[in-house]
């Protein structure tokens, strides 16, 4: 592990610009670059960090010749110093070449790639800020299957360890540094647990759960935690005050990106170049009514699977749709590929009603947010009325669309995506087979067959509190 020397007697400041879960929102980069430039004018030694999930969510980035190269080029131009690995960094097998183009470091302590994986990752890095030693440790979330939330084929040859267990190994590293930062892609609640367990951390720059924090966020066991919503609505300017080798002051300022009055002209030119693909402008349908929420778009995807796959039931994981809303008007390939950027294939499975319920129960992990969405059946769920977020599931039942009892012994033709197939195939009887069509193509075909669509709302889910 790298070693840092304790430095200095008088108070000095380290300034950091932090992002998380940018999800390829390259349109925000002209203002992000201007924010970075304005801070760098005042603080020439400014550090710029990302907490991961830089890619996935914009076809101009995700479908570029080298997938996600636009984000890397723009991050280089802004002057990023390092990024954590997010689970979506593994969505497409373009990470090794991207690392060769990156002018910043990839930091992750709980990943152990084989030599064949071709990944150039460091567990920690020490940044020299005018003689102050700022140590950074990186971590990525690991699910119950022992990997980040991505298709298992994307992480072959890579072993992961639980973040909490790994961070414990770096306490001595922190003692040698003037400031210690955890660049974390594990989620807000897990960041709080990290702070409670490891008070020697000075700062956690968080991501993964898209939690919008504010200047009023209290310190957690003395540790400052920051995070923003996804797609760059805000960035965080962090000031660490250091005296005698210890952090004696911590402050976070959240800056609104969209309303920032200045744009970088150079970055605007780069964004225009990356976005100039006529394919994205092709119209595939018309939305007669708006789709106001991601859940309404989840059910549009479910309907596409149901009808195009000629299925009895369709299942879509809640994270399978990446667009938050859709306005009235033309629906373009840009919209389709923003909704479904994952290159998943449509998969057919033959499952009993009991197995379908098991998928919903197991995958949801007791959370309404994580509950997969279905079409062809109505999912009746009860949430705990005492839960502040109304997310804790108490029960899940399925009914037929006309309100009859769902036959759990009957075998149904189910169409889902290859990510869901990989997540559930270990506890169902039929591993399924590919329909040899990408889910984005299936969605496109469905929209083109309808021509005009209307939002049907939440017709396949009923939520009650108890």
Language-model segments: which ranges?
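Acidic, metal/ion-coordinating pockets
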Residues: 4-259, 265, 296-304, 348, ...
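Catalytic centers of hydrolytic enzymes
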Residues: 9-13, 19, 41, 169, ...
